[in-house]
Amino acid sequence: MARVKRSLNAKKKRRVVLSQAKGYRGQRSRLYRKAKEQMLHSMTYAYRDRKDRKGQFRRLWIQRINAASRAHGLTYNRFMQGLKAAGIEVDRRMLAELAVNDAAAFAALVETAKKAIPAPSESAA
């Protein structure tokens, strides 16, 4: 059997890795082994952070809703409790959007939530 020389395949593989590593500092963009290792780490971080981004946005939405509802005299927890009791199913993303861009609509939701919150029971004392 003839011997297979991997010249073209190896060069292509290295060229792809080095082109993906453009923009890295120092040896990580010029040397194949360092670039390959950095690419593996970069892809791991990218995968992890794509998952983490969803939680970061949820935290941001909750902060915005909390700030806006406190301006109307209600904490985030009580506001969400009131919305659930009133049967209003608006997700946090839309609530945060309303809080930032449409204060009148958000104020109406807060008033609805205030009316729907059950009175605290006296038997707990």
Curated annotation (Swiss-Prot):
Q: Which InterPro entries match?
A: Ribosomal_bL20 (IPR005813), RIBOSOMAL_L20_CS (IPR049946), Ribosomal_protein_bL20_C (IPR035566)
Q: Name one GO biological process term.
A: ribosomal large subunit assembly
Q: Could you name the Gene Ontology cellular component terms for this entry?
A: ribonucleoprotein complex; ribosome
Q: Which UniProt keywords apply?
A: Ribonucleoprotein, Ribosomal protein, RNA-binding, rRNA-binding
Pfam families this protein is in? Answer: Ribosomal_L20 (PF00453)
Q: Name one GO molecular function term.
A: structural constituent of ribosome
- NCBIfam families for this protein: rplT_bact
Free-text function comment from the UniProt entry: Binds directly to 23S ribosomal RNA and is necessary for the in vitro assembly process of the 50S ribosomal subunit. It is not involved in the protein synthesizing functions of that subunit.
**Protein's name in the database:** Large ribosomal subunit protein bL20
> What gene makes this protein?
rplT
